[in-house]
Amino acid sequence: MNIFEEGSPFQRFLNKMTDLLVLNLVTLLMCLPVITAGAALTAMHYVLLKMVRGEEGYIVKSFFRSFKRDFRQATVLWILYVALAALMVSNLVLVLEGSGKYPLWLPSSILVVGLLALMFMIYTFAMLSRFDNSIYHTLLNAVTITFSELPRSLEMAVIVLVPLLAFVRFPVLLPFVVLFGLSVPGYGCAVVYDPIFRKIEKQIWEEENAEYPDDREDV
């Protein structure tokens, strides 16, 4: 089989990487105003889950559909996470500069809280892109799933952190970050949380059908 033949595994791989490249550039562009980053991440997860499920259509069109629809809630949630991150970073700097004044376990505790916040954030924007809910319940569900699916949550944290730490250690990787630094780790996360979302969707479907059963009789 010709590897460049339409439908070949190599051709499908190239198509997938092209979609991830386009999605990464659009997401990065919409993150530049900073305040819109939450909506951009939500839209990215919206597209990525469709890609994982083989439902992707027009990448840019799907992205901006979610971006517009979820902008308000995503922006509020993003501001909350930025405020939390700023608080943790300032506390960590304060503790590290005040060497000897604070217990040795305190810096580690702050880092653990930061890791939890990262896992909360991944679920938050991914769930916002998929489920209609209030800000409070989106956060509550993100926290609940983080702990109930802790192995998967830690797996997603690793998927996100390894490329980030690699870039910090090797700045020469900047071109990869620009081209794939958001979409590729995000795609990995979508592969991980897709089974969780499918279970939630099944539960919602069962509850809706139990509430409104088919009242037709067999004839």
Description of each model-found segment:
Residues M1-I110, F120-Y123, M127-V219:
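Helix-coil boundary and N-terminal low-complexity module in membrane systems
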